[in-house]
């Protein structure tokens, strides 16, 4: 059973739209999913239903500036004044809501793409609230981040935070589709499932350009989650699972994704591992052979 809810961000009282999928029997645990950039919670319903059929309560919310967590449609891709810090605190607001709604159960946090950065920044501050972490579709650290950040700040200053810059969009993602250009989709790098791509390209809640404010905060979030400073690490044996498609251009290279894994070990999480799925692109939870990924995740979920 999947139900709709709305809660308020503890950061700035923004309405956060949320979905909850519950199992029919006694729940084994809770899984909170944190989605990526330029998408929304409904895209994860099949995965949520798979997990709830296996006995898990699944929760997901729309990030600020995404889906239904906006004041107006003009705010898609805009993170408001709270920015990336509020985005991270929104994850905690959902975690606290789950605590109110359900009995104490093993708690898993799964973040995809931009969400994979957000869940690491969340873990940096609140690792005592989770029992397992999945880092899915992780963007490797981009050494040009600082230049992009300067450009995004200048754009926001001179054109306004709501300005949508094609240049920022191109610099951020312009090369990702080159290996798949012959397939005829501008975002074929996302996954190889043609039905998913058709839905993606027809979905106005996916096919929007991030605002200058959004890019400022996206790049600041990348800096925070990769920085070795400020980690309030209290659970050194927290299982941290990096999972990505081997053909995901966000990886940059295997060496780069291994640096992300090494960083988590460096800050103290000894039980960190990496699984690359051959032939899969960015959205491994939506790939043609996604059941393989779903099964992999399910096998590693903590439960009572």
Model-assigned labels for residue ranges:
Residues 1-25:
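N-terminal cap/lid segment of alpha/beta-hydrolase-fold proteins
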Residues 31, 35-39, 113, 246-247:
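Active-site glycine-rich loops that stabilize anionic/oxyanionic intermediates
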Residues 43, 48-74:
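Conserved alpha/beta-hydrolase
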Residues 79-99:
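Alpha/beta-hydrolase active-site loop
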Residues 119-205:
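Alpha/beta-hydrolase-fold enzymes
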Residues 242-244:
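Short beta-strand/loop motif that positions the catalytic acidic residue
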Residues 267-304:
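Catalytic active-site module of serine/aspartate enzymes centered on a nucleophile-bearing elbow/loop
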